[in-house]
């Protein structure tokens, strides 16, 4: 099944690409979610008429993400947690804890945007945490974990 993508989809394509996908993926996920339309002649013509509008929306989302990234790059947060003598935490600091700390600092960050590639943080110290705001925009936040 051929579809025209209405937004960037990881491992598939970007806005305006005409791609071939399995029929079930197109019918049951992409089209109902509004991420793609079937690549008929009528839809192709309608998409070309809306292309500028969709690209403008995409540019606005990117600009907003870049503005948020500039704010986040300047932020350092301190999280206190119970820890043993050697700096090992009783428990761990995960994406929710980091997102909540950033929200308490006055920034809106969803826990799904926080990237912890090595899993939850289990030791005291300073960590550079990546915040994926957009597929092209990643902010770095310095998180310091101190013992209570």
UniProtKB/Swiss-Prot annotation:
Signal peptide: none annotated. GO terms for molecular function: rRNA binding; structural constituent of ribosome. GO terms for cellular component: ribonucleoprotein complex; ribosome. PROSITE patterns: RIBOSOMAL_L9. One of its GO terms (biological process) is translation. The keyword rRNA-binding applies. Disulfide bonds: none annotated. Pfam families: Ribosomal_L9_C, Ribosomal_L9_N. Keywords: Ribonucleoprotein, Ribosomal protein, RNA-binding, rRNA-binding. Binds to the 23S rRNA. Belongs to the bacterial ribosomal protein bL9 family. This is Large ribosomal subunit protein bL9. It comes from Acinetobacter baumannii (strain SDF). The lineage of its organism: Bacteria, Pseudomonadati, Pseudomonadota, Gammaproteobacteria, Moraxellales.
């Amino acid at each position: 099944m051929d579809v025209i993508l209405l937004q960037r989809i990881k491992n598939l394509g970007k806005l305006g690409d005409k791609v071939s996908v399995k029929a079930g993926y197109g019918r049951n996920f992409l089209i109902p979610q509004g991420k793609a339309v079937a690549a008929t002649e009528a839809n192709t013509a309608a998409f070309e008429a809306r292309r500028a509008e969709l690209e403008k929306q995409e540019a606005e989302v990117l600009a907003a993400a870049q503005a948020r990234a500039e704010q986040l790059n300047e932020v350092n947060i301190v999280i206190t947690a119970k820890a043993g003598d050697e700096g090992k935490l009783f428990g761990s600091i995960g994406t929710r804890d980091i997102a909540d700390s950033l929200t308490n600092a006055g920034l809106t960050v969803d826990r799904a945007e926080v990237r912890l590639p090595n899993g939850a943080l289990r030791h005291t110290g300073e960590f550079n945490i990546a915040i994926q705001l957009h597929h092209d925009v990643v902010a770095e936040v310095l998180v310091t974990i101190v013992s209570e």
